[in-house]
Every structure is written in structure tokens, then in C-alpha cells.
């Protein structure tokens, strides 16, 4: 299971205010003034509160291509952040498959926007695709897999999300991708979902070699919790 020391899960259609864990240890013999001082220092400089933003309330500046999925918002040292996910529509291409039928291409999107005193601007657009598929395209975000954390305690939040995609004719593992994003740094895990105990393996990107403490454990823990593709049905 994933350790709650490093992050808190966000599930769609819910609101969670994330708080820093309280300090443990023996408090016996602590004076009233010392206790008050400890309480003050335990308050984080930035309280990363994550909430689901209904479609009608997601700012119009937060554009998303094709089929809009959801919008989430949190605040950190850089200001108010928005994360929007969407799914492209399958497009028929000029390529032909082995059977002579047209093939299709489909894209999946994720957008990170930031709101400051100057307005809302796009920080990153993330895009992936299945290209020239002559069979069935199966593609979607893993909707319950969205997390906002501050594992390195630098007051700049990281967010984590996952999606799956494949071109297939049967029930088999899909390509599965997990991303942790902090500022302009992206840490990627790629592999296969697990279907009927087949698949589930993954590979960490080389960027994890110099990742902050906790990032690797965070990524592998989430992967293990969400690798079962059939568990979504």
C-alpha cells in the first residue's frame, strides 16, 4: 500500500483538504509556552488544499482539447494551480491496415495551468497517442489516480497522474504511464497494466536517479495500487 506519509489521494467528486501530519513523540514535561510554540511551527507555510472543480466553474482560460474529463485546483508557493484532463476523439487516417480498412489515431491530453496576479497561463501541455491503429483503440485516464503532494517540502507541489492506452483485438495489458510533475520537472514511469495476472511490469525513467527523496517510493507505490486494469470494472 502507499504510505500516507508522502501524499494524500484525491477522488473525483470529492473535496479533501490536505494537512501536514502532526508531530509525534512524548510531550510529557513540556511547558504551556513550549507547546504553543510547537503548534505554530507545525503550521505549513502553504496549505495545499485540493478540490474538484465542477465543469461550469473551471476557468474558461483552462482550455482542454476534445472531450473534457475533469478539473482540479490547488494552491502552492507559485499561486493557484489547475490540472485539466481530456480525451481526444478517434480520427480516421489515410493509412490502411493489413485488411485494407482505414486506421485511426487518438490522443490523450493533460494540462497544467497556473493563476497569478497576471492571470491564468499554461505551464505545460502533456499529450500522448495511439497512431494508425487498425484494430480497437482503448484509451483513458485512470480517473481516481490523481495526487497532489509536497514530498520534498519546498512549498512547490508535485502532482501525479496515470493513463492507459492500447491498440488491440482482445483483453490484454495496456500501455500504462504514470507521471510526477514538479514545476518543469517530469518523472515518468512506463510499463503495462495487469490483466488476469498478466503484465504489471514497469520501468522508471532515468530522471529518477536524481529525483528528490521519496519520489521513487511514491511512484512505485502508486503503480502497484493502480496496475490492475480489470479492477476498474
Where are the model-predicted features located?
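A short, structured loop/turn motif at beta-sheet edges
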Residues: 147-157, 181-186
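C-terminal motif of bacterial Sec signal peptides marking the signal peptidase cleavage site
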Residues: 19-22
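Bacterial N-terminal signal peptides that target proteins for export
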Residues: 2-11
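Short consensus segments that form the blades of beta-propeller domains
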Residues: 85, 92-104, 134-139, 166-172
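Beta-propeller blade repeat segments, especially FG-GAP/WD-type strand-to-loop junctions
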Residues: 105, 109-124, 170-193
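Acidic/hydrophobic-patterned starts of short beta strands in beta-sheet-rich repeat architectures
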Residues: 78-86, 152-163
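Surface-exposed loop and turn segments in beta-propeller and other repeat-based domains
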Residues: 123-138, 196-209
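Acidic, small-residue rich beta-repeat scaffolds with periodic aromatic anchors
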Residues: 26-79, 174-176, 181-233
Amino acid at each position: 500500500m502507499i504510505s500516507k506519509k508522502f501524499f494524500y489521494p484525491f477522488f473525483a467528486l470529492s473535496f479533501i483538504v490536505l494537512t501536514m501530519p502532526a508531530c509525534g513523540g512524548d510531550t510529557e514535561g513540556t511547558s504551556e509556552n513550549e507547546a504553543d510554540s510547537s503548534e505554530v511551527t507545525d503550521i505549513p507555510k502553504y496549505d495545499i488544499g485540493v478540490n474538484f472543480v465542477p465543469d461550469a466553474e473551471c476557468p474558461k482560460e483552462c482550455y482542454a482539447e476534445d472531450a473534457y474529463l475533469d478539473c482540479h485546483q490547488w494552491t502552492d508557493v507559485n499561486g493557484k494551480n489547475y490540472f485539466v484532463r481530456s480525451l481526444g476523439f478517434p480520427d480516421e487516417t489515410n493509412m490502411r491496415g493489413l485488411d485494407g480498412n482505414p486506421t485511426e489515431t487518438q490522443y490523450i491530453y493533460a494540462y497544467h495551468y497556473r493563476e497569478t496576479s497576471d492571470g491564468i497561463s499554461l505551464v505545460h501541455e502533456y499529450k500522448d497517442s495511439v497512431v494508425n491503429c487498425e484494430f480497437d483503440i482503448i484509451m483513458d485516464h485512470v480517473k481516481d489516480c490523481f495526487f497532489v503532494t509536497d514530498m520534498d517540502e519546498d512549498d512547490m507541489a508535485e502532482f501525479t497522474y496515470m493513463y492507459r492506452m492500447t491498440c488491440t483485438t482482445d483483453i490484454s495489458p495496456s500501455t500504462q504511464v504514470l507521471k510526477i510533475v514538479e514545476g518543469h520537472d517530469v518523472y515518468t514511469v512506463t510499463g503495462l497494466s495487469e490483466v488476469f495476472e498478466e503484465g504489471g511490469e514497469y520501468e522508471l525513467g532515468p530522471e529518477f536517479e536524481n529525483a528528490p527523496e521519496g519520489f521513487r517510493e511514491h511512484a512505485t507505490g502508486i503503480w502497484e495500487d493502480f496496475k490492475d486494469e480489470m479492477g476498474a470494472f
